[in-house]
């Protein structure tokens, strides 16, 4: 910051003098004001600083004081104290010399910054006469400037230590005065007492150190005028007592928690001199101290290491401890009383004025000098800025001073301006940014009561679709300001040493796939390179579902020939041969056994016959086996017989289940309607590709007519995506939010922002049904497959008969899955009723979303929402058929 010095008509502008920095500006400017001559003409009186009137009143009092009259009489009589004074009794030090007078040496006054000669100092200490320049002939009606302010009424630098000493930074002056006082006390104590008793004139030093506190107010007014002209605020100085205004290194406040470094201070000499000068101003100092007692009490405790105790002068007749104050800071101290400061410092609290009611002040700290403004500390006004938060509840973001609804903190009254979407019942949302915050500003909805919360506020299964729950450990470091622009996944559980799920034999549910941060929001490898569906027999690339299992073409042909043929294969080894892509032809017996174990069969009716054939083959080879091999054969038999309880096609459903698909949403950008809906459309396009692959791998689906296959997928894709999203929300975020994708999770704010809040609420309710009904992964897989065959045109499909048979087979498979877990027929019937009611509830949600997407497609150009090509074609061609009633869902129960 560069500021030209100048106070208008208060004093002449120095030619092109510039100071840099915030702190030296103030002190250097005041020094320039004092050292430059002020106005000397009558018209300059109107441009005097605000303290001019106060100076005139004090000057009038000084003129009538008996001491000044005595000094004036002594000056007229030619006494040694005949100093030249101004019209108001001030000590004139900088006046111009008269041409008629001989040019004398410049006066060396301690307050002028120059060091007097030793002889002059001794003479001044002993009260010897000194020559002073002649008075000026100009008009002296205007108040004198410069050091004439330091007249004979100056109170001895005691009460104005924070004003004059800090402004001029003349600590050496006090040392010189103290030395002179010691010389005067030691060498001329008797003569001094005699002169005081007889009313004899005293030295100029004694007169200089006597009087009232005129300079204190004058220096304050002058300091304020200079600071206002420079654009600096000095109101922070007014809130500190004089003892706390010593100038120091206030640019760099001590680090919190680190003991302060002791500053070099003028110890004993200055302390003794100051102790002797504080006698006549003790009352005022006491009042100033009591005025800020709440602040100074806690402030002094932290500065006990900086206090300096010194004994007073013996001549002063008092001995005490002098406590040097702390350094001066132009920034507001954290322990100051905020109430008084907010009334006068509007420009200082400019951010606070925009932020609404101020937060409670932080606990006092001995070195909390520099104000660290945090927008999260401004209470209710943070609601407007916190609307950009996408992954956290507002109640979990604000600090201890700003409380959300239901937090119970002192600033809960400001919760009226909080966004109405965030209620206390919503609980902890996705990825709390602030955590418990020491219990003060924890997440809303009871997160703060629980203290430390998990980083997600929920538990999710560690792997797969299992319902096992595992707790997360809170991450060590969160982002600053409570701002969460990245998804805070806990690093210990995200960094994996093994290969990702897309490298396994099949994609699986991708239960553990998480992205570290928003910068890692890249698509998984299965998006660029779709995972190769491996054959369950040899591990080669699978070509589809053959005979009830996902196999390659070679194993498909082998099983057909081996199962239909009459050949009996025997293993030359121990029935544990390795069957892979390169060694699958080495042992037909082990290969056929592995086909049976994978669930391959020529038909459901032949399952028992195939089991007997397998037992016969193993029985014929049992004569040459050991007891260990016989135990292994019994386990194989029991495993084959168990297929009657574990449906065969469940293995296929688990193998062909699509993996997790990312939306490619940029979470670093603020949420908007267009961005959220465009990301949802992009996610729908990517998921639709996986739905097509998944449907083609379903048992019996390829037997449908090609047109029927396309029609079924185009009509049921919305319901399938909603059903799968509800399951992901249940398994990943405990149905608290909508888990569309790892990089696109909808909390309450996003639900409102997307303008589809009612649809999102219904989808979240569907996700909660999975938990209330305790849906198992096997039931979910079968219900999802059945949902594909639950909507058809009113006119029917081209091969409606086969479609009905295929749908009935999937209904029977669902009933068989229910019967495997329950032995009571009544319990099975009740469970079947619950699951079918859940399937029926998906259709109204899908229809409502069809209407929303169709309306959005029409207005997409106006709202800047992007639709991928395939999504736009399906919505524009097939969705109108559903909305018009030409295509209707198939319900299990009457609606």
From Swiss-Prot:
Region called Interaction with CCAR1, residue ranges: 567-894
Cross-link Glycyl lysine isopeptide (Lys-Gly) (interchain with G-Cter in SUMO): residue positions: 371, 496
Signal sequence range: none
Location of the DNA-binding region in this protein: 534-607
Residues under site feature: Interaction with coactivator LXXL and FXXFY motifs: 696
InterPro entries: Andrgn_rcpt (IPR001103), NHR-like_dom_sf (IPR035500), Nucl_hrmn_rcpt_lig-bd (IPR000536), Nuclear_hormone_rcpt_NR3 (IPR050200), Znf_hrmn_rcpt (IPR001628), Znf_NHR/GATA (IPR013088)
Domain NR LBD: 644-875
Residues joined by cross-link Glycyl lysine isopeptide (Lys-Gly) (interchain with G-Cter in ubiquitin): 821, 823
Subcellular location: Nucleus; Cytoplasm
Region (Interaction with ZNF318) residue spans: 1-562
Modification note: Phosphorylated in prostate cancer cells in response to several growth factors including EGF. Phosphorylation is induced by c-Src kinase (CSK). Tyr-510 is one of the major phosphorylation sites and an increase in phosphorylation and Src kinase activity is associated with prostate cancer progression. Phosphorylation by TNK2 enhances the DNA-binding and transcriptional activity. Phosphorylation at Ser-65 by CDK9 regulates AR promoter selectivity and cell growth.
Region (Modulating): 1-533
GO MF annotation list: androgen binding; beta-catenin binding; DNA-binding transcription factor activity; estrogen response element binding; nuclear receptor activity; steroid binding; transcription cis-regulatory region binding; zinc ion binding
Biased composition (Low complexity): 44-81, 178-200
Quaternary assembly: Binds DNA as a homodimer. Part of a ternary complex containing AR, EFCAB6/DJBP and PARK7. Interacts with HIPK3 and NR0B2 in the presence of androgen. The ligand binding domain interacts with KAT7/HBO1 in the presence of dihydrotestosterone. Interacts with EFCAB6/DJBP, PQBP1, RANBP9, RBAK, SPDEF, SRA1, TGFB1I1 and RREB1. Interacts with ZMIZ1/ZIMP10 and ZMIZ2/ZMIP7 which both enhance its transactivation activity. Interacts with SLC30A9 and RAD54L2/ARIP4. Interacts with MACROD1 (via macro domain).
Family, per entry: Belongs to the nuclear hormone receptor family. NR3 subfamily.
Protein name, per record: Androgen receptor
Taxonomic lineage of the native organism: Eukaryota, Metazoa, Chordata, Craniata, Vertebrata
């Amino acid at each position: 910051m560069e500021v030209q010095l100048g106070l208008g008509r208060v004093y002449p502008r120095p030619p092109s003098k510039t100071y840099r920095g915030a702190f030296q500006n103030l002190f250097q400017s005041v020094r320039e004001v004092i050292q430059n001559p002020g106005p000397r003409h009558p018209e300059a009186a109107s441009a005097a600083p605000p303290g001019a009137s106060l100076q005139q009143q004090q000057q009038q009092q000084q003129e009538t004081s008996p001491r000044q009259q005595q000094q004036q009489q002594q000056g007229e009589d030619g006494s040694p104290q005949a100093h030249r004074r101004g019209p108001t009794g001030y000590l004139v030090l900088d006046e111009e010399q008269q041409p008629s007078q001989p040019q004398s040496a410049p006066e060396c006054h301690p307050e002028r910054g120059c060091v007097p000669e030793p002889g002059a100092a001794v003479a001044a200490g002993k009260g010897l006469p000194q020559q002073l320049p002649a008075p000026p002939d100009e008009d002296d009606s205007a108040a004198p400037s410069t050091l004439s302010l330091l007249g004979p009424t100056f109170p001895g630098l005691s009460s104005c230590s924070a004003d004059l000493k800090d402004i001029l930074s003349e600590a050496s002056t006090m040392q010189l005065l103290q030395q002179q006082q010691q010389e005067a006390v030691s060498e001329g104590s008797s003569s001094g007492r005699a002169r005081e008793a007889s009313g004899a004139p005293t030295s100029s030093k004694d007169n200089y150190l006597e009087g009232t506190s005129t300079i204190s107010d004058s220096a304050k007014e002058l300091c304020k005028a200079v600071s206002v002209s420079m654009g600096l605020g000095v109101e922070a100085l007014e809130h500190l007592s004089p003892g706390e205004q010593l100038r120091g290194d206030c640019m760099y406040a001590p680090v919190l928690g680190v003991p302060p470094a002791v500053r070099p201070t003028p110890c004993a000499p200055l302390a003794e001199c100051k102790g002797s000068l504080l006698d006549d101003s003790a009352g005022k100092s006491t009042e100033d101290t009591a005025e800020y007692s709440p602040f100074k009490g806690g402030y002094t405790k932290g500065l006990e290491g900086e206090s300096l105790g010194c004994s007073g002068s013996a001549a002063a007749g008092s001995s005490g401890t002098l406590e040097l104050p702390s350094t001066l800071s132009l920034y507001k101290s954290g322990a100051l009383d905020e109430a008084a400061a907010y009334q006068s410092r509007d420009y200082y609290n400019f951010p606070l004025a925009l932020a609404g009611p101020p937060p409670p002040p932080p606990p006092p700290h001995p070195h909390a000098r520099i104000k660290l403004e945090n927008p999260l500390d401004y209470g209710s006004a943070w609601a407007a800025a916190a609307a950009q938060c996408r992954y956290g509840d507002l109640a979990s973001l604000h600090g201890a001073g700003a409380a959300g609804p239901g937090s119970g903190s002192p600033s809960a009254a400001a919760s009226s301006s909080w966004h109405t979407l965030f209620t206390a019942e919503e609980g902890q949302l996705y990825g709390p940014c602030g955590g418990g915050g020491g219990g003060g500003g924890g997440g809303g909805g009871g997160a703060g009561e629980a203290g430390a919360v998990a980083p997600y506020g929920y538990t999710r299964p560690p792997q797969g679709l299992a319902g096992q729950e595992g707790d997360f450990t809170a991450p060590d470091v969160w982002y600053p300001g409570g701002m969460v622009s990245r998804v805070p996944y806990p690093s210990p559980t995200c960094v994996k040493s093994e290969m990702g799920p897309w490298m396994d034999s099949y994609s699986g549910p991708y239960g553990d796939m998480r992205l570290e941060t928003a910068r890692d929001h890249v698509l998984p490898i299965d998006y660029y390179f779709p995972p190769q569906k491996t054959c369950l027999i040899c591990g080669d690339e699978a070509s589809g579902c053959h005979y009830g299992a996902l196999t390659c073409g070679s194993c498909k042909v082998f099983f057909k020939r081996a199962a239909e043929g009459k050949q009996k294969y025997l293993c030359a080894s121990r029935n544990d041969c390795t069957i892979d892509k390169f060694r699958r032809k080495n042992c037909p017996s082990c290969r056929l056994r592995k086909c049976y174990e994978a669930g391959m069969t020529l038909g459901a009716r032949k399952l028992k016959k195939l089991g007997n054939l397998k037992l016969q083959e193993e029985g014929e080879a049992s004569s040459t086996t050991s007891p260990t091999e016989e135990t292994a054969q019994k386990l194989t038999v029991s495993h084959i017989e168990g297929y009657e309880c574990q449906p065969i096609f469940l293995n296929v459903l688990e193998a062909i289940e699509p993996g997790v698909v990312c939306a490619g949403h940029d979470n670093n950008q603020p949420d908007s309607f267009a961005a959220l809906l465009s990301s949802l459309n992009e996610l729908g396009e990517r998921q639709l590709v996986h739905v097509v692959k998944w449907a083609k791998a379903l048992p019996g689906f390829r037997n449908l007519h090609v047109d029927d296959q396309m029609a079924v997928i185009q009509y049921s894709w919305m319901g399938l995506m909603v059903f799968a999203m509800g399951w992901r929300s249940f398994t990943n975020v405990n149905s608290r939010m909508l888990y569309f994708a790892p990089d696109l999770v909808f909390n309450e704010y996003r639900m409102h922002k997307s303008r589809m809040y009612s649809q999102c609420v219904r989808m979240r309710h569907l996700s909660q049904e999975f938990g209330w009904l305790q849906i198992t992964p096997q039931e979910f897989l079968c219900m999802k497959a059945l949902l594909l065959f639950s909507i058809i045109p009113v006119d029917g499909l081209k091969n409606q008969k086969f479609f009905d048979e295929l749908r009935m087979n999937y209904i029977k498979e669902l009933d068989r899955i229910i019967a495997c877990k329950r032995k009571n027929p009544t319990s099975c019937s009740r469970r079947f009723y619950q699951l079918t009611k859940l399937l029926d509830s998906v259709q109204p949600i899908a229809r409502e979303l069809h209407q929303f997407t169709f309306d959005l497609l029409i207005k997409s150009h106006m709202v800047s929402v992007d639709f991928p090509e395939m999504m736009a074609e399906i919505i524009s061609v097939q969705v109108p058929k559903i909305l018009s009633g030409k295509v209707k869902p198939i319900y299990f129960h009457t609606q």
